[in-house]
Amino acid sequence: IGLYFLTENIRVDADRVNITEQNDNSDEDVTGGWLVEVDNYNTDPHISVTMSDKNQDMWITYKSPELLSANQESYLQQQFNAIRDAVYATDKNSTEWENLIDMYAMARLYVVRELMQDEEGFHGSFYLHKDRGADTKWVAGPVWDFGNAYNNDRHSYIWDNPQFECFLIDHIYQFPRFQEAVKNVFGDFYRDAYASMDKFIDQ
């Protein structure tokens, strides 16, 4: 009894998340690839990132690799501590966070979540991935889990929802450069895709 979906899952592969697959429990090159999820639950293998302005920590479940060496775990922890510090910086003209996160990928994910009114889109099932390399950035996506989509009857923004702790986006949206990126992403969508959406749906 219930509703079941047959769908692709999210995993590292050439036709899925196309990044270098990092070996489990390895010290070979801990810079990547990584596939992680900001998770609702702290039951799966994860690291915890302390969030001083939240009622709970940010739980980062690692999907690939699945088993971490001490060096892999240390690298992942350092990466997300650095992301937290850069995103929650008081100076919203800082570009430090852009050295860690792909801004336009985050803007695209934000537009999708906002259009879908997915209130828990930055609370759980919030995937990020990073390819191998010291200078590669974390890329938001792929999208997953729209169980609470179209459920926002308060006509507010998804990051402003007391029901769910929305991680990262509640401060990322305050950066003027991110706001401009969101305008550009939505403008491109409205100009190039929205006009032909009915035709696409009818195919």
What spans do the regions from the language model cover?
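C-terminal catalytic region of ATP-dependent kinase domains
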Residues: 66-70, 77, 117, 133-203
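A generic fold-level signal
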Residues: 104, 121, 134-136
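Internal "kinase-insert"/substrate-recognition segments embedded within catalytic cores
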Residues: 2-111, 119
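Structural recognition of the beta-strand scaffold that forms the well-ordered cores
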Residues: 2-8, 34-37, 108-109, 127-129, ...
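Catalytic-loop signature of eukaryotic-like protein kinases
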Residues: 118, 123-132
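Short, solvent-exposed loop/turn segments at the edges of secondary structure
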Residues: 2, 31, 123, 164-167
